Amino acid sequence: MSKGFLVSLEGPEGAGKTSVLEALLPILEEKGVEVLTTREPGGVLIGEKIREVILDPSHTQMDAKTELLLYIASRRQHLVEKVLPALEAGKLVIMDRFIDSSVAYQGFGRGLDIEAIDWLNQFATDGLKPDLTLYFDIEVEEGLARIAANSDREVNRLDLEGLDLHKKVRQGYLSLLDKEGNRIVKIDASLPLEQVVETTNAVLFDGMGLAK
């Protein structure tokens, strides 16, 4: 790649994005692709501290706008400190969540103004958007059941939210898919992990213009 390529992974809770990413890394490395993987919120020291505040299960009184602004603050620091330098160095950057999460969770899920969220995303990223977004779709009940069955996963504040919020979040993602289908590719995350990885690999390499 002559320049960097930015990929974001999106989806409702329990979609398995992290597991897919872990399985993809050896494939990418075997192809000689220089890749940086990172996550939101977090990715850098300041971002990880903000992540702790956002996801702390005891912070049940957090206001929706406070939550949004914390995500935006983490996003800005993460981009400046880690993501942009990697893109400038010509690397493939894969982000576990990015701008679409704010629209889905705080816009559709929390009911905040989507235009305001779009403006904040634009402000924080200077207009940067992913070259490709992989949306891992799964029924809300199945995703939450996966989380409940995973004893190794630490429960966070969003896991404790009611079913209604998670359904709104999924609808938000599906709305984004309709609106930005040229950038966002839907992947059926209910399939066995091996099949999801195979599909993701094909979509990713096609998007990057590389042979599988």
UniProtKB/Swiss-Prot annotation:
SUPFAM superfamilies, per database record: P-loop containing nucleoside triphosphate hydrolases
Positions annotated to bind ATP: G11, P12, E13, G14, A15, G16, K17, T18
GO biological process, one term: dTDP biosynthetic process
Catalytic activity of the protein: dTMP + ATP = dTDP + ADP
Annotated organism of origin: Streptococcus pneumoniae (strain ATCC BAA-255 / R6)
E.C. number: 2.7.4.9
The keyword DNA damage is assigned to this record: no
Transmembrane segments: none
Protein name stated in the entry: Thymidylate kinase
Record keywords: ATP-binding, Kinase, Nucleotide biosynthesis, Nucleotide-binding, Transferase
Superkingdom: Bacteria
PANTHER family noted in UniProt: THYMIDYLATE KINASE (PTHR10344), UMP-CMP KINASE 2, MITOCHONDRIAL (PTHR10344:SF4)
Listed GO MF terms: ATP binding; dTMP kinase activity
The UniProt record lists the keyword Kinase: yes
Gene behind the chain: tmk
